[in-house]
Amino acid sequence: MLDETGKALDLFFNPRNAGPLEAADAVGTAGSLEVGDAIRLMLRIEAGRVAEARFLAFGGAHAIACGSALTVLVTGLDLAAARAVTPEEIEAAVGGLPAPRRPAAARAWSALQIALAAYEGRTFVAPEPAPVPAPAAAPVRLLAPKHDSQPRIVRDVPLAPAEEARLIAEVIESVRPRLRADGGDVTLVAVEGSKVRVHLTGACSGCQLAALTLGGLQKRLADTLGRPIRVIPEEKRPLVSIAGAR
């Protein structure tokens, strides 16, 4: 499982080197938009080394994390060293991947090999992926962070409830577009002291992505409000309730 407080979470919410690279010398695309998972890697090469790397990803949180990690891995490498990067190194750079998510690292690796092959005038044929074992049947449960997130800076003067309500709504709205692109969504249910209750739907309600979503949201809220916050998932979605807000 992805570490909700570690590398994958950081790479997902704060992706490195995301966006187009106009001066790219080598471009590799792997995956398919039709199936909802694709990554494009762009490299600027100078004196036989990767001077700059950027990526575009269409798909889930793991595609974004792997693309981000790969650009960091290859920047500064000579072409031989870049070719030698493995899917396992990409997995390690994101803090590990569960078996069903390992194809994200394989796609990022394929995009790298395709880009280098095109630059060098070669043809790269991606190996057939190994079949992913079917996970054992288990009831789906929502995962909540085990502890409050501490803010980077604690506010000397607490915010008024109405101002907190506005900021909480803004933070949640800011993450919804990315979650919707990943096939899920999050909505605010209630704010009760340090507890922020939310309702997850779609892909975000499964146990793998729920931890990633809730952990990142909790940290953002704590930093924004300047006080410890705990985000708790709710099975049902009642009317929004914010204690003290008018």
Swiss-Prot record:
One of its GO terms (biological process) is iron-sulfur cluster assembly. It comes from Cereibacter sphaeroides (Rhodobacter sphaeroides). The keyword ATP-binding does not apply. Keywords: Nitrogen fixation. This is Nitrogen fixation protein NifU. GO terms for molecular function: iron ion binding; iron-sulfur cluster binding. May be involved in the formation or repair of [Fe-S] clusters present in iron-sulfur proteins. Belongs to the NifU family. Pfam families: NifU, NifU_N. The keyword Mitochondrion does not apply. The gene is nifU.
